Design a protein with these regions (language model features):
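Conserved helix-turn-beta segment immediately C-terminal to the redox Cys motif
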Residues: 56-57, 66, 71-94, 114-117
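N-terminal "domain-start" segment that seeds a small globular fold
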Residues: 24-51, 71, 136
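Thiol/selenol-based redox catalytic cores and closely related redox-interacting motifs
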Residues: 113-114, 118-161
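N-terminal secretory signal peptides that target proteins for export/translocation
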Residues: 1-4
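Thiol-based oxidoreductase modules, predominantly thioredoxin-like and allied folds used
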Residues: 87-105, 119-131
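Bacterial N-terminal signal peptides
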Residues: 8-21
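Amphipathic alpha-helical repeat scaffolds
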Residues: 62-66, 154
C-alpha cells in the first residue's frame, strides 16, 4: 500500500475516532437525519443523491485543481481503484473557497482531473464548503460536529457510512 493511501487511512481513522464520539447537535426541527438525506449535483449536471451510496462507506473530499495538495487526487484514485468493489466510494467536491484555487467551470475541472489524474470516481459540480453559502451537507456536518468539521483548506475529508 502506498504511503499516500496509508496517510489517508490514518487521517480518516483519527477523524472517525474524534468525530464519532461527538454528540449530534443538529436542530430537531429538520427532517435531515443522516448524510444520505443530502444530494449534490454531479460534475456532469445530474442529480447525485448520497442515498445512492447507502450501505457503503463514502469518503467526501473537497478538492481544488490548483492547490499544493492537488496531488492527493492520485491517492484518492488509488483508494477508489482498490476498495470500490468492497464498498468504498470516493466523492470529490470541487470548491473554490480557499484562495481561488479551483478552475472556473465543472467542465474544466472534469477535463483537468481526467487528463492529469485519470480520475473516474464520482465528482460533484463546484460547490461551497464553508460559510453561509455552503452546500447543505457541509452546513449539516458543521452544525452536527462543530467547528473542527468545517473545512479549513482543500482536501478536507469526511467519512460517512
Amino acid at each position: 500500500m502506498s504511503r499516500a493511501i496509508r496517510l489517508v487511512f490514518a487521517f480518516v481513522a483519527v477523524s472517525i475516532g474524534f468525530f464519532g464520539g461527538m454528540p449530534m447537535s443538529y436542530a430537531a426541527s429538520t427532517t435531515v437525519q443522516t448524510a444520505h438525506d443530502f444530494s449534490f449535483t454531479s460534475i456532469d449536471g445530474e442529480d447525485l443523491p448520497l442515498a445512492n451510496f447507502k450501505g457503503k462507506a463514502v469518503l467526501i473530499v473537497n478538492t481544488a485543481s490548483m492547490c499544493g495538495f492537488t496531488s492527493q487526487y492520485s491517492g484518492l484514485q488509488d483508494l477508489w481503484d482498490t476498495y470500490r468493489d468492497r464498498g468504498l466510494v470516493v466523492l470529490g467536491v470541487p470548491s473554490d473557497d480557499f484562495g481561488g484555487q479551483e478552475l472556473d467551470s465543472a467542465a474544466e475541472v472534469k477535463s483537468f482531473c481526467t487528463i492529469n489524474y485519470n480520475i473516474d470516481f464520482p465528482m460533484t459540480d463546484i460547490a461551497r464548503v464553508k460559510g453561509p453559502e455552503a452546500h447543505p451537507f457541509y452546513k449539516w456536518v458543521a452544525d452536527a460536529h462543530g467547528g473542527l468539521a468545517v473545512p479549513r483548506w482543500n482536501f478536507h475529508k469526511h467519512l460517512v457510512d
